[in-house]
Design a protein with these regions (language model features):
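Soluble catalytic regions of membrane-associated enzymes that act on cell-envelope
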Residues: 197-231
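Transmembrane and membrane-interface helices of multi-pass
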Residues: 2-207
Length: 231
């Protein structure tokens, strides 16, 4: 009995973080679907699948990274341990606020927020951001309570499987982009520009050396697609 309690108390903070990351990633991925809505989906299966795979994989992975960066230093420094959850919740709310604001800017102007564009925001835009931060802060406080409940009732295996899904989708998205980029298939690669902080993988030289892609064949296929689009 004492051993199980010790194990449970030691795993509780990590369990909370894992479930909080899972819940936050689900919210962020849902909001990120706006980038897919604003994108004109091509007719090919890969062209349709890639935006969804890339959006969920990329935004969920960024979410996990942001929350881990906020949580880990506080947990490693005993004087700051009481701040771990509040700072993680604040980081989640800030990241979601930034994403919503970026999606609004991208839908209107087709570029993402950076320090230069943020400097051009007027008072009403900053006010909107402040309201969103408060709303999302309250949302993530509720999700934090749910994460605590899930950490106490769900198995470690379930959270490990769920936390691995975004990472698998991230790798799959990079693999799809690298393959499409090698084949000069803009119907897939063009969506990567729609996501903020997205730096997709390219591997033309490696795949060509491995014999998986023939550059000349890929070039001809791209020309044929252009002719077909013009017709």
């Amino acid at each position: 009995m004492s051993e199980s309690r010790a194990a449970g108390s030691g795993a509780a903070p990590a369990g909370w973080l894992a479930w909080f990351c899972i819940l936050a990633s689900a919210i962020v991925s849902f909001v990120g679907l706006r980038y897919v809505v604003e994108y004109r989906l091509p007719s090919t299966p890969a062209g349709v699948a890639f935006p969804f795979v890339a959006t969920v994989g990329h935004l969920s992975s960024v979410t996990i990274m942001v929350l881990a960066i906020a949580w880990l230093p506080c947990r490693l420094l005993p004087p700051l341990r009481s701040l771990a959850r509040p700072l993680t919740i604040l980081s989640a709310a800030s990241w979601l606020t930034l994403l919503v604001m970026d999606s609004i800017v991208f839908a209107q102007h087709r570029f993402h927020i950076d320090p230069f564009t943020a400097a051009l925001f007027d008072a009403s835009t900053w006010s909107l951001g402040a309201v969103l931060l408060l709303v999302f802060g309250a949302l993530f406080v509720v999700l934090s309570a749910n994460a605590s409940r899930l950490a106490g009732t769900r198995s470690a295996t379930s959270r490990r499987v769920l936390i691995a899904v975004p990472l698998v989708l991230l790798l799959l998205g990079h693999a799809m982009h690298a393959w499409a980029d090698d084949r000069n298939d803009g119907r897939v690669t063009s969506y990567a520009r729609s996501l903020p902080f997205k730096y997709p993988l390219t591997a033309k030289r490696y795949l060509a050396r491995a014999g998986w892609v023939d550059p000349e064949t890929a070039r001809k296929a791209r020309l044929e697609r252009r002719v077909g689009d013009d017709d």
